[in-house]
Structure formats: C-alpha cells, structure tokens
Amino acid sequence: MQAQMEDFKIKEEIWIEKYRPVRLNQVAGQEETIERLMSYVATKNLPHLLFSGPPGVGKTASAVSIAREIFGEDLWRENFTELNASDERGIDIVRNKIKNFAKTAPMGGAPFKIIFLDEADALTSDAQSALRRTMEKFSSNCRFILSCNYSSKIIEPIQSRCAVYRFRRLSDKAIRERLEYIAKEQDLSITDGGYEALIYVAQGDMRKAVNSLQAAAFIDVEKPISRETIYRTTATANPEEIKNLIETALRGNFRVARKELNRLLYEEGLSGEDIVGQIYRVVSEMDNLMILDLGLSERDIVGLVDIIGETDFRLTEGASEKIQLEALLAHFALSREE
C-alpha cells in the first residue's frame, strides 16, 4: 500500500492545472465562442473582452490560451498578467497593480500586453469607474480581458468598451469526454455510476468535476472509482436518497422523513444548504411520472419551490439548519392536505 501511495504522489500535481487547456481549440464545450476568439488570434487584432458565465466553464483557460497563441511560448508570460478582483475589491488594485503593468511597453516587439482581471464583478463601482478610465488611457498598448459570473454587475461604460462573450454551463457529454481523457492519462478505472456521479456533482463545472475526480482517486487507489466514492468525497447525498426523502414527506410520513434528514445531517455530515440545494434540484427536475404518482398539481410544485427558496434564504441568514429543514419537510407533508 505504501508503494502505491508513493507512486500516486509521484504522479500527482493539481489536475486542473495539469490538464488545463493551453490552446483555444482545447477548451471544451464552447465551440461558437472559441471560433470567434480564434479569429482574433489569427489576425492578432484583439479588442477588450468581457467573458461572462458560471465557474469552471473555460473563461480563464480561454484568456491564457489567447495570450499563449498571440505572444508565443517565449513571450506570453512577460506580456500577460492575471489578477483576481475578489482578492482586492477596491480602487487600489486599479491604481497600483493594473496601472503599473499597463504603463510599461510590451516585451519582445509584441503589439500590446494583456491584463486578465478575473471575477471583475467583485470590484466596487468606484473601482470599475477607475478601471474604465484606465482602459481608455492605455488602450494603445494594452488589452483587457475581464471575467465575471454576472455581466449585470459590470457597469455599462465598461461593457460598451468590450466584446462580450457568454460562456454557458458545460454539457454532460463535454464533461464526461474530458473525464474519460484524464482517467486514461492517469490509468484510472471508473464505473459508469462513478462518471454519472461526477457529472451530477459538477453541475456543468469542469473545474469541480476534475477536482472531485482527483479527490476520489486518492481514496480508491486499489479499485474502480464508484458512485458511492464520489458522493462520499464530495459531501453529496445520493440523489436517490434525496428523492426518497421528498417522496416520504409528500406522502405524509413526516417522522420517517425527519429520521432520514437527521441521518444526512449527523451521520453523513451534510450541510443544510447542500441538502436544500439537492432538494431543489429534485423538485425542479421532477418527471411527469413522479408528479402523477404523487398526485401533485402545477400549483403544488410552485408552492414547493417557493418554500424551498424561503428555507434557503433563512439558512443564509444564519437560522438553525435542523429547525428550518424539519419545517420544510413539515410543509411538504402538509401540502397534500391543503
């Protein structure tokens, strides 16, 4: 076992870095966006860019790949800098780090430098206003690539100066193909259930999928990575358990549902917010057969989603997980009698 662990450590580096795309055509699941970005690279005529979309869908990989392809492997690091706005939200990041890099000339005869500002929607309004002025002042020798989860949080004057690209959540197919490639490279054995669990946990986030796979690989060194291993290492309940919990409550068996809830909280160690999130996924994805079997109407589904949202809000405000989740199950149990 010791030898296997040593072999595992020799192989190991962070897989999201090891398997990060280095060329635009390696970015998964964003074909239309990548095609347009490649046209900028081909002409080396790059506007300011704004990448919008959820985490783990290729925004950072695309920005780095653009720099690699425009400047080449010898010069891209000298002409590219990456900053994270969530580390410093105020105006100082613009006045100091961004301006200091922007005002220096490009290296090696490059036409311009690139500043990649990740999580730009974390910047305050004042910082964004200062950034807008900096973009104008240094546009002759510097291009900005901004990345955000929500483009609505970026002020209009910045949006109007950028070509905006929206990165969508990755499809199950795109995630599975990438995971299968990594599994082959790492000589891993993964069951079909393991792949399904990774896709379920990831929710379209490639970074989360790869991190979850690496965590599971460290646990199941000697055997195929299974569905159970993925759920255990990611602190995720089996979707079937959540489905049974909901069905039990909706059929009026509150005590049984509460017992299962306590098992998930105290034996499995799941957080209240995670459980609420999974309950929402099951309710929102209920198929017609399940709805018919439980005798639910459209109005019932609307009511369930409403109370789930209220419970989620209360948990984020610091309310007791046990009380709020039991109240949620009680509402489910009573909903059939209303």
Curated annotation (Swiss-Prot):
Keyword ATP-binding annotated: yes
Record-level GO BP terms: DNA repair; DNA-templated DNA replication
A Pfam cross-reference name: AAA
Chain residues that bind ATP: 53-60
Annotated Gene Ontology cellular component terms: DNA replication factor C complex
Keyword annotations of the record: ATP-binding, DNA replication, Nucleotide-binding
Gene Ontology MF terms: ATP binding; ATP hydrolysis activity; DNA binding; DNA clamp loader activity
Recorded superkingdom: Archaea
Family note: Belongs to the activator 1 small subunits family. RfcS subfamily.
Subunit structure: Heteromultimer composed of small subunits (RfcS) and large subunits (RfcL).
Role this protein plays: Part of the RFC clamp loader complex which loads the PCNA sliding clamp onto DNA.
Protein name as catalogued: Replication factor C small subunit
Organism lineage: Archaea, Methanobacteriati, Methanobacteriota, Stenosarchaea group, Methanomicrobia
